[in-house]
């Protein structure tokens, strides 16, 4: 049973937990983290969701819900390790964006690693494929309706593009 901490609309901890899968009450929110792994050459890691999951066979960045008692950064680092086998210190993660959407606060992080897909260990029940794409390819996947969740990506797309470009310049 997965438990989440609950927050109010101002992201103040409510002092109660919630069981995943049970609808939230109005005014209750939980934290979700997205994490983009970016290579020094500017390519981004995307993973393909397991076909039995909601949005199955679609591409996404790594992410998930923060567990009760877990900080946003620790959640992102845990999801990165669980889903693709990449260990990162939470303090290495750079917050790219925070948005409140529906019943959640979504914190989007980036971390830079010089990896190939062969370096990854995919979590079989979550992820069936992974690849590194440049920003143009990523945008095309989004335009083709093959990247989820669509509305979140649209919110931080320019911030992600700027991070990728800045990172590429710093590594050339």
Model segments located where?
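A residue-level structural signature of the nucleotidyltransferase/glycosyltransferase Rossmann-like core
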Residues: 4, 28, 43-44, 58, ...
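Short loop segments at secondary-structure junctions
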Residues: 10, 39-42, 50, 112-117, ...
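Local beta-strand/beta-hairpin segments that build beta-sheet-rich folds
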Residues: 14, 94-96
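Conserved hydrophobic "DFG−1" position in protein kinase catalytic cores
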Residues: 6, 37, 46, 110-111, ...
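A glycine-rich, hydrophobic loop/mini-helix early in the fold
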Residues: 32-63
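The catalytic Nudix box helix
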Residues: 45-46, 61-94
């Amino acid at each position: 049973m997965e438990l989440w901490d609950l927050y109010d609309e101002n992201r103040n901890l409510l002092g109660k937990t919630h069981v995943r899968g049970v609808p939230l009450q109005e005014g209750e929110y939980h934290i979700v983290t997205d994490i983009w792994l970016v290579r020094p050459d500017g390519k981004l890691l995307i993973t393909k969701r397991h076909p039995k999951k909601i949005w199955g066979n679609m591409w996404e960045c790594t992410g998930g819900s923060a567990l009760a008692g877990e900080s946003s950064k620790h959640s992102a680092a845990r999801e990165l390790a669980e889903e693709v086998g990449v260990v990162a210190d939470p303090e290495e993660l750079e917050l790219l964006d925070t948005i409140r959407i529906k019943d959640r606060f979504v914190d989007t992080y980036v971390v830079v690693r010089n990896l190939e897909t062969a370096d990854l260990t995919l979590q079989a029940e979550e992820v069936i494929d992974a690849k590194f794409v440049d920003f143009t390819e990523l945008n095309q996947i989004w335009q083709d309706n093959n990247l989820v969740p669509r509305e979140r990506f649209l919110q931080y797309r320019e911030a992600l593009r700027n991070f990728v470009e800045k990172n590429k310049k710093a590594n050339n």
